[in-house]
């Protein structure tokens, strides 16, 4: 569901706000996402497919960035095997369920505390 600049996905364990790269939600190959968890914390992740990474490296070979495309890096990177928000949401479901999101995603807002 589109909400301004963001594409929203709601699941029982999280709400994800995707800032999509180039392309529609069905075929986008990279996106930044804020994941709002049920404990009140918010984590940040970046999704890429391998072809999207290859395009970045090719552009960097041409531009001379990163020593002519010698490497690629992105903070909080999750590589997915296929494009689309649906594939990203499936990955998020597993990351949240397994608690791997705590290691993978940067914490940008901590758990909300109830001070009574």
Model segments located where?
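Short helix/strand-capping turn motifs
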Residues: 2-101
């Amino acid at each position: 569901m589109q909400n301004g600049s963001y594409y929203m996905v709601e699941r029982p364990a999280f709400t994800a706000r995707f800032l999509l790269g180039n392309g529609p939600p069905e075929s986008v190959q990279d996106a930044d996402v804020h994941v709002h968890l049920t404990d009140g914390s918010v984590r940040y992740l970046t999704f890429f497919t391998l072809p999207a990474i290859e395009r970045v490296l090719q552009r960097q070979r041409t531009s001379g960035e990163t020593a002519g495309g010698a490497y690629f890096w992105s903070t909080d990177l999750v590589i997915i095997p296929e494009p689309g928000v649906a594939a990203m949401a499936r990955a998020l479901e597993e990351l949240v369920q397994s608690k791997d999101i705590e290691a993978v995603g940067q914490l940008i807002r901590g758990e909300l505390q109830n001070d009574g």
